[in-house]
UniProtKB/Swiss-Prot annotation:
Residues 1-17 form the signal peptide. This is Major allergen I polypeptide chain 2. The long form is preferentially expressed in the salivary gland, while the short form is preferentially expressed in the skin. Glycans are attached at residue 50. Belongs to the secretoglobin family. Keywords: Allergen, Disulfide bond, Glycoprotein, Secreted, Signal. PROSITE patterns: SCGB. GO terms for cellular component: extracellular space. It comes from the Eukaryota. InterPro entries: CH2-like (IPR015332), Secretoglobin (IPR016126), Secretoglobin_Domain_sf (IPR053723), Secretoglobin_sf (IPR035960). It comes from Felis catus. Pfam families: Feld-I_B (PF09252).
Amino acid sequence: MRGALLVLALLVTQALGVKMAETCPIFYDVFFAVANGNELLLDLSLTKVNATEPERTAMKKIQDCYVENGLISRVLDGLVMTTISSSKDCMGEAVQNTVEDLKLNTLGR
């Protein structure tokens, strides 16, 4: 289920035309904070992105699921995230998007 949410988040990001170079660090920061189980760390991450109260509530519920499922669940999700992020397809897409962003930024000046 969470893997499907990751794919959906990445698709929405691309559909909205948001630059991957800007969103990836934010995504991984929030994901780490959620999976870590530390509520203060999650609050700090969500403050950086100006999360609304409903978004904060939803993320805290997801974090509660991680805490309830224990360390093994967190480690397994971390492995899945690493596997997806370091796959050939994902890396190729990231490089392609970065090159396109650099071209657009250079042409825009």
